[in-house]
């Protein structure tokens, strides 16, 4: 994937417009989870070290375009950066130009307040572009959306490049999907086959084995001829599951953990996959299955992980995901993980430092895995050619 990288550019004295992902949760004017800001700080430091005049912006929440309310403001992000030692200020009225002093960071107010942002109005893209000498796209999480601050500005800025976060994300995904070290194992969890169908289809052409979990696994279990009781599954997609299983190595669990109701207090019973009763629901894989899958992961050279294999939020149905998580953490494989539930499992089991790369983009991660072109990356590639 050939894009210009910010790390390769001379930015001394240049006006640099960074599109970051600072869409963080805020409560009572305070940032409650700072992961995205922390991920962006090295990019801001690098731009300052290179002598750039630094502007940074992001979306926050879902404001109505053209209508500003204090809840939509990036002020809590500015306060956070001030506390982190940066010389930083917020600029609300910036579309007709902004002065940036040496060594300061100017945060441009929430882009989604600007009329035309979401529909990628070229006039707005040109206004963003006029603010800078170099546009830096560093928000992988919004790369699957063609908007004025992710696409339009990149079309019209004198130079458009990928920031360190975006470049690292593209490198890691490329390593896992374009030319993976083999065997390559993909783990796809989630409640429905329908929501991950394109992911499964795309991975079936790349992966040597696909491990399915959650409600998705239930559909494969049913397609293999087993009773799934009251489990969440999609009867209409059993033919699709059969076809995928016929053409790809997708191991079906040999044992499962079942409960009589979907609740944190429900008792868990472990049993063979062919012994599930009509009033039971499958909420996790059993120990034998988990150990078999852990062995597959142990022998892998590349692991792509998207989704848990059971209802890990409930302690009684956590063990399958825990065993799989530790197998990935202890593996020598190049591992890449993405998706909200996956990140929650990584946090729960404390294995973040043992995953080779953790993707920051939910929807963008899935679309990349599906083989779709990400508009914000496509325009950077186009600009790199010119």
Curated annotation (Swiss-Prot):
A GO CC annotation given for this chain: cytosol
List of residues binding substrate: 21-23, 36, 59-62, 112, 145
EC number: 2.7.2.3
Signal peptide: none
An example Gene Ontology molecular-function term: ATP binding
InterPro entries: Phosphoglycerate_kinase, Phosphoglycerate_kinase_CS, Phosphoglycerate_kinase_N, Phosphoglycerate_kinase_sf
GO BP, sorted A to Z: gluconeogenesis; glycolytic process
Positions bound to ATP: 196, 313, 339-342
Database matches in PROSITE patterns: PGLYCERATE_KINASE
Pfam families recorded: PGK
Entry's localization field: Cytoplasm
Main location class: cytoplasm
Catalytic activity: (2R)-3-phosphoglycerate + ATP = (2R)-3-phospho-glyceroyl phosphate + ADP
Cystines in this chain: none
Keywords: ATP-binding, Cytoplasm, Glycolysis, Kinase, Nucleotide-binding, Transferase
Entry keyword Endoplasmic reticulum: no
Pathway where this protein functions: Carbohydrate degradation; glycolysis; pyruvate from D-glyceraldehyde 3-phosphate: step 2/5
Family: Belongs to the phosphoglycerate kinase family.
Quaternary structure, from the entry: Monomer.
Protein name: Phosphoglycerate kinase
Annotated source species: Haemophilus influenzae (strain 86-028NP)
Gene of this entry: pgk
């Amino acid at each position: 994937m050939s894009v210009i990288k910010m790390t390769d550019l001379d930015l001394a004295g240049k006006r640099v417009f960074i599109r970051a992902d600072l869409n963080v949760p805020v409560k009572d004017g305070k940032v409650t989870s700072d992961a995205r800001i922390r991920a962006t700080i090295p990019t801001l430091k690098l731009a300052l070290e290179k002598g750039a005049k630094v502007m940074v912006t992001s979306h926050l929440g879902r404001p109505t375009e053209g209508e500003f309310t204090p809840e939509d403001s990036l002020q809590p992000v500015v306060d956070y950066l001030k506390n982190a030692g940066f010389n930083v200020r917020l600029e609300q009225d910036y579309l007709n130009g902004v002065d940036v002093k040496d060594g300061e960071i100017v945060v441009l107010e929430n882009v989604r307040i600007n009329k035309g942002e979401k529909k990628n109005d070229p006039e707005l893209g040109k206004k963003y572009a006029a603010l800078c000498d170099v546009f830096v796209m560093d928000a992988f999480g919004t790369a699957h959306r063609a908007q004025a601050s992710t696409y339009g500005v990149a079309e019209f800025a004198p130079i458009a490049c990928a920031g360190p976060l975006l470049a690292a994300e593209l490198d890691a995904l490329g390593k896992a999907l374009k030319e993976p070290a083999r065997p390559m194992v993909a783990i796809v969890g989630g409640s429905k086959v329908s929501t991950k169908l394109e992911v499964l289809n795309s991975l079936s052409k790349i992966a040597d084995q696909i491990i399915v979990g959650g409600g998705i696994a239930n559909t494969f279990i049913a397609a293999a001829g087993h009773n799934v009781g009251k489990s969440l599954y999609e009867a209409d997609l059993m033919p699709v599951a059969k076809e995928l299983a016929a053409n790809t190595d997708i191991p079906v669990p040999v044992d499962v953990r079942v409960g009589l109701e979907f609740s944190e207090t429900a008792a868990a019973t472990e049993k063979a996959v062919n012994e599930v009763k009509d009033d039971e629901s499958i909420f996790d894989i059993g120990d034998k299955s988990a150990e078999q899958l852990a062995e597959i992961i142990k022998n892998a050279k590349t692991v792509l992980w998207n989704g848990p294999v059971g209802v890990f939020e409930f302690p009684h149905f956590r063990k399958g995901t825990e065993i799989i998580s530790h197998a990935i953490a202890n593996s020598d494989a190049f591992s890449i993980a993405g998706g909200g539930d996956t990140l929650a499992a990584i946090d729960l089991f404390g294995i973040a430092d043992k995953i080779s790369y953790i993707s920051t983009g939910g929807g963008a991660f899935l679309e990349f895995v599906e083989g779709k072109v990400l508009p914000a990356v496509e325009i950077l590639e186009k600009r790199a050619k010119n």
